[in-house]
Regions:
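Glycine-rich phosphate-binding P-loop
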Residues: 1-23
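Conserved beta-strand segments of the P-loop GTPase G domain that flank and frequently precede/overlap
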Residues: 6, 35, 50-54, 71-77, ...
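Post-Walker A helix-loop "phosphate-sensing" segment adjacent to the P-loop in P-loop NTPases
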Residues: 23-34
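Switch II (G3) loop of P-loop NTPases
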Residues: 35-37, 43-64
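Inter-motif core of Ras-like GTPase G domains
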Residues: 58-79
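Conserved C-terminal guanine-recognition region of P-loop GTPase G domains, centered on the G4
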Residues: 83-113
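Beta-strand-loop-alpha "switch" segments that mediate conformational coupling across diverse proteins
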Residues: 110-158
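NTP-binding/hydrolysis catalytic cores, primarily Walker-type P-loop NTPases
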Residues: 151-182
Length: 182
């Protein structure tokens, strides 16, 4: 499966999230290629999944988004009020038109403070402008590190002694790869 992550240009959190999702996938026993190549330029016999940072708004990234089974759009909370999302919306719409079978998940990062009502409204409007997209999760990103003060809310089935990342990232992982513990 190809999973492409995108966001506004120069959003370093996208590469970090791609790395964490790939790490979780490897920990689940899958072979994962974490690079930013042309989509489908990998041997599916060698890798189960391809996780791509497609956040640089290039022709290659557009092709990566168009070839993905799952597209994760990551927004920063400060982007919700202060940036124009027309370019990102256009890229996501073009990817959806090129690949109508792709699932589009939108996630937002915020610091220790929760989103304001205005930011929440902006986020919902952003998601509503993408046909078939859904809001996946909000991730706590503070000092360039994903972590959580919500871990007490995570189901016991998903808590382990050797967790690789924040509960929100593990929750997003389960949504992207449709996994569940039995």
């Amino acid at each position: 499966m190809i999973v492409a992550l995108t966001g506004n240009d120069n959003n370093g959190a996208v590469a970090d999230l791609a790395e964490e999702l790939a790490l979780l996938r490897v920990a689940a026993g899958n072979r994962v290629l974490l690079v930013c190549p042309e989509p489908c330029a990998y041997d599916p016999q060698l890798y189960d999944d391809l996780v791509i940072d497609a956040s640089h708004n290039t022709t290659r990234d557009a092709a990566s988004l168009a070839g993905a089974a799952v597209i994760v759009a990551l927004l920063r909370h400060e982007d919700l009020e202060h940036r124009d999302h027309a370019a990102l919306l256009a890229r996501l719409r073009a990817a959806s038109e090129a690949n109508p079978g792709a699932r589009v998940l939108v996630a937002v990062t915020h610091g220790r403070q929760p989103l304001t009502p205005h930011q929440t409204g902006c986020l919902l409007v952003f998601v509503a402008q993408l046909p078939g997209a859904r809001l996946a999760d909000t991730l706590v990103l503070d000092h360039d590190t994903y972590h959580s003060y919500h871990s007490a809310l995570e189901a016991d089935a998903y808590k382990t002694a050797n967790v690789l990342c924040a509960p929100e990232v593990r929750h997003l992982y389960r949504q992207v790869f449709n996994t569940s513990r039995r």
